[in-house]
Amino acid sequence: MVPKINYSTNILSYHISDLRYRGRICIFGLMKAFSVEQLIDGIQSGDKRLLGKAITLIESKKTEHRELAEKLLKEILPFTGNSVRIGITGVPGAGKSTFIENFGRLLLKTGKKVAVLAIDPSSSLHKGSILGDKTRMEELSREENAFIRPSPSSGFLGGVANTTFETMLLCEAAGYDTILIETVGVGQSEVLVSDITDVFLFLKIIGGGDELQGIKRGIMEMVDIIFINKVEGDNQQKAKNTKLELLRALHFLPSKEKNWKKSSSSGHRPKFFAP
């Protein structure tokens, strides 16, 4: 027998008529309604809770919510475009979450405000997502000047969610001057993130496969920085070899330039970070 759930105006109560269903029950709290003006005031005052509500609003697929979301985005647009946007990609297991947590904490020490938009893969059958990135960045999530928002990809290709750009604008309006976007991490479809970021960083792990094959996947053509990760112990020499192999392989690719202001007259992109 399916358990009965009773709703009231003030509280969400439930009655489980069959204890066998207890492990399958999910109780969703009722969300208080906020006006667009309240959301804007909260965003600009640095209220993380209201920033989260605003992001939930733009992620909603309901028609009435879409109309409010459009109004909200129009109002906050003059306060956007003032951040450094960094996209971070890599195959699953490359250490993206660990890298972002450490990089984010380093940025905080320099006085930056950091927002992390973590995109989690969604089930192709049920469209659900675990959204576990925030738990993997526990220390960063406790920082006052850091904001972490996991979002499901919902099957959207490009390594990001279909509202990632709008979410980024909301974070900029909230005063976050560095936006880190962690992509799903599945391969060549992730190149869309390069179009909405200033810097596109690729985390490479040692022994990740033939470098020419990696270039065929397409993503290597779009990156600005290649970061060779998990370099410790016996892997140091392997990392140097991987760097040389990548440098040789990248000669087959056309150059990709962005309008960066260089702090040094030397160096060529993509840049490598490895011992």
Description of each model-found segment:
Residues 197-213, 224, 231-240:
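Conserved Switch II/interswitch segment of TRAFAC-class P-loop GTPases
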